[in-house]
Swiss-Prot record:
Keyword Oxidoreductase applies: yes
TM helices/strands, residue ranges: none
Residues binding ATP: G41, I42, G43, K44, S45, T46, K70, N211, R212, P235, D236, L237
Protein name per Swiss-Prot or TrEMBL: Light-independent protochlorophyllide reductase iron-sulfur ATP-binding protein
UniProt-listed PANTHER family: LIGHT-INDEPENDENT PROTOCHLOROPHYLLIDE REDUCTASE IRON-SULFUR ATP-BINDING PROTEIN
Source organism of the structure: Cereibacter sphaeroides (strain ATCC 17023 / DSM 158 / JCM 6121 / CCUG 31486 / LMG 2827 / NBRC 12203 / NCIMB 8253 / ATH 2.4.1.) (Rhodobacter sphaeroides)
Quaternary structure, from the entry: Homodimer. Protochlorophyllide reductase is composed of three subunits; BchL, BchN and BchB.
EC numbers for this chain: 1.3.7.7
Family classification: Belongs to the NifH/BchL/ChlL family.
Gene behind this protein: bchL
SUPFAM superfamilies: P-loop containing nucleoside triphosphate hydrolases (SSF52540)
NCBIfam families assigned: DPOR_bchL
Amino acid sequence: MSPKDLTIPTGADGEGSVQVHLDEADKITGAKVFAVYGKGGIGKSTTSSNLSAAFSILGKRVLQIGCDPKHDSTFTLTGSLVPTVIDVLKDVDFHPEELRPEDFVFEGFNGVMCVEAGGPPAGTGCGGYVVGQTVKLLKQHHLLDDTDVVIFDVLGDVVCGGFAAPLQHADQAVVVTANDFDSIYAMNRIIAAVQAKSKNYKVRLAGCVANRSRATDEVDRFCKETNFRRLAHMPDLDAIRRSRLKKKTLFEMDEDQDVLAARAEYIRLAESLWRGLDPIDPHSLPDRDIFELLGFD
């Protein structure tokens, strides 16, 4: 098949953009699937790992898939930087049939299963391909058969076709933000991308998590303007930073009042996502409107 043989859809998913066909055999079934997005450095991996831990505390069988070349998504769950799917595929000259599950799936805190997809070298290849190959491997080894929750932790605020690949599998997208202009600006772009993809895929926006934020006034103002919603608030706690340094989740840290409150918030978030949320239909704002809403007093 050549590019000219592909059907080019029109409309909100990008004028002239090519939709990557998702083979029925590669669809994730039987589990609730969440994709976590947000501005680079906002704490997506910390949020994803603590959310995975919270789901596991609730008795759910959890798989977390890191989709960043840094491959540190599951660092606090496993206590180490685990080999990536792309690395182990290189070791077998890209013959996936030679791989065993223990080559690329690692057990972390409270039984959470951890996979790091990794990524191609800078300036080469496509991250979407790596995500696709990771899901194929998991399906081929039947590693998704007994999973209740899958969490994709996705690279930065990139919204190109490649790193939108997890949206093909996700039921809902969660955006991690902070109570500042740059984070909310990135969230606005992610909302636009997810809403566009939702016209072709099942994914829907769940809401946002205000992370590393003393207050939530700017986030709440944006949500009110765009019909979005805040799902949780994780304050800027030193214990969360220290947990990263200690290679641990928040659920393994000393139990002071702040830590217990943050754990309870993660449990509450996991419970609400598992239970299901009322649908919302948010809209992104033009750049000028974002500046007028948040950029000036």
